[in-house]
């Protein structure tokens, strides 16, 4: 049987660094909730069997009516960390018939610049890969490591950027492998910040697929203006 595709959007974070009065995934950007753009991108890819959004059990901001017409399901099973929310989401996908050998694409709700074209680029590059992989960009800036003993932000040294890539999402792995990887990381006392880290912890080497600058993560207050500018352009609908 052909492996199917599922999308998982962990959406239980508070977005404390964004300075917003509500979780940043619900803040309005270019006329819509930030979460809408990710849902719309996956909805435009008819090859997905289901898109699942995992929100916090006590989330009072989510309103499904704001995403009318888009295909997705919601589960209030968010955990205390991203890793916990993703694991709970993987368990929930079984309700929709997901099998261990099916693919899951995990995507940050705070990356509204994702497009159907980027999603399909990732799928095309990884559908026959034995491990899976992630969207990423080569590091372009010079990297400085701060002196941990300095109280005023002094540079300790410059880090070589050769071979360094900045991880993005979606991150695409087999459901069974990713679940096993997260459970192993948890058992070893690690709370990892992305899915690729868990797969690496299991001893595998995920593949990097070049992404796009537009698919950046909205993190700080000034990022909202950049997201607004990108998403207001006609290309954002492609």
Curated annotation (Swiss-Prot):
Alphabetical keyword list: Isoprene biosynthesis, Nucleotidyltransferase, Transferase
Molecular function terms from GO: 2-C-methyl-D-erythritol 4-phosphate cytidylyltransferase activity
Catalytic activity: 2-C-methyl-D-erythritol 4-phosphate + CTP + H(+) = 4-CDP-2-C-methyl-D-erythritol + diphosphate
Domain of life: Bacteria
Site (Positions MEP for the nucleophilic attack) location in chain: 161, 217
Site location (Transition state stabilizer): 17, 24
Signal peptide, first to last residue: none
Enzyme nomenclature, EC number: 2.7.7.60
Name of the top EC class for this enzyme: transferase
GO biological process, one term: isopentenyl diphosphate biosynthetic process, methylerythritol 4-phosphate pathway
One of the Pfam families matching this protein, by short name: IspD
Pathway: Isoprenoid biosynthesis; isopentenyl diphosphate biosynthesis via DXP pathway; isopentenyl diphosphate from 1-deoxy-D-xylulose 5-phosphate: step 2/6
Keyword Repressor assigned: no
NCBIfam families recorded: ispD
Similarity annotation: Belongs to the IspD/TarI cytidylyltransferase family. IspD subfamily.
Functional description taken from the UniProt entry: Catalyzes the formation of 4-diphosphocytidyl-2-C-methyl-D-erythritol from CTP and 2-C-methyl-D-erythritol 4-phosphate (MEP).
Protein name per Swiss-Prot or TrEMBL: 2-C-methyl-D-erythritol 4-phosphate cytidylyltransferase
Naturally occurring in which organism (per UniProt): Paraburkholderia phytofirmans (strain DSM 17436 / LMG 22146 / PsJN) (Burkholderia phytofirmans)
């Amino acid at each position: 049987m052909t492996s199917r595709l599922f999308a998982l959007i962990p959406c239980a974070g508070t977005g404390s660094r964004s300075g917003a009065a509500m979780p940043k995934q619900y803040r309005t950007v270019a006329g819509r909730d930030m979460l809408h753009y990710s849902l719309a991108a996956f909805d435009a890819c008819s090859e997905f069997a289901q898109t699942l959004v995992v929100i916090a059990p006590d989330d009072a901001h989510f309103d499904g009516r704001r995403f009318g017409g888009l295909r997705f399901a919601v589960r209030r099973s968010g955990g205390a960390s991203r890793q916990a929310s993703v694991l709970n989401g993987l368990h929930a996908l079984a309700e929709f018939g997901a099998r261990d050998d099916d693919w899951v694409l995990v995507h940050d709700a705070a990356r509204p610049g994702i497009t159907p074209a980027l999603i399909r680029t990732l799928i095309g590059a990884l559908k026959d890969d034995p491990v899976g992989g992630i969207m990423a960009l080569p590091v372009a800036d010079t990297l400085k490591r701060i002196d941990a003993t300095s109280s005023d932000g002094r540079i300790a040294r410059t880090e070589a950027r050769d071979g360094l890539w900045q991880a993005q999402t979606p991150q695409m792995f087999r459901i069974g492998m990713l679940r096993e990887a997260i459970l192993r990381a948890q058992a070893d006392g690690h709370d990892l910040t992305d899915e690729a880290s868990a797969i690496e912890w299991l001893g595998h080497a995920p593949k990097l697929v070049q992404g796009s600058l537009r698919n950046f993560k909205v993190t700080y207050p000034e990022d909202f203006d950049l997201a607004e500018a990108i998403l207001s352009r006609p290309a954002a609908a492609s």
